[in-house]
């Protein structure tokens, strides 16, 4: 998709909108639902911190898939412990194979 915008700063702002929307949803969860439900995350950093960092680092598409996998691992029979966002995207990850962005099992595998 090519944007017909002459202003380079405007182009950056428009391309950053999905990332900001994802991080905004996490902020809304942290300040509305999370205080009511309480702290129950089995990992460090918390799942919302993980999601915020993943979306900031990799964008809404890849970071969203990483966050989904982390949320599915954060359950009573799932993983626990220190589980940081990877520094780089996995080598086999492509936009049309989104499940390859995430670790579905294990911690920091």
Curated annotation (Swiss-Prot):
Keywords: Cell inner membrane, Cell membrane, Membrane
Main localization category: membrane
Localization per Swiss-Prot or TrEMBL: Cell inner membrane
One term under GO cellular component: plasma membrane
Pfam families documented for this protein: YidD (PF01809)
Recorded topology in the membrane: Peripheral membrane protein
Family as reported in the entry's similarity comment: Belongs to the UPF0161 family.
Function: Could be involved in insertion of integral membrane proteins into the membrane.
Cited PANTHER family: MEMBRANE PROTEIN INSERTION EFFICIENCY FACTOR-RELATED (PTHR33383:SF1)
Protein name: Putative membrane protein insertion efficiency factor
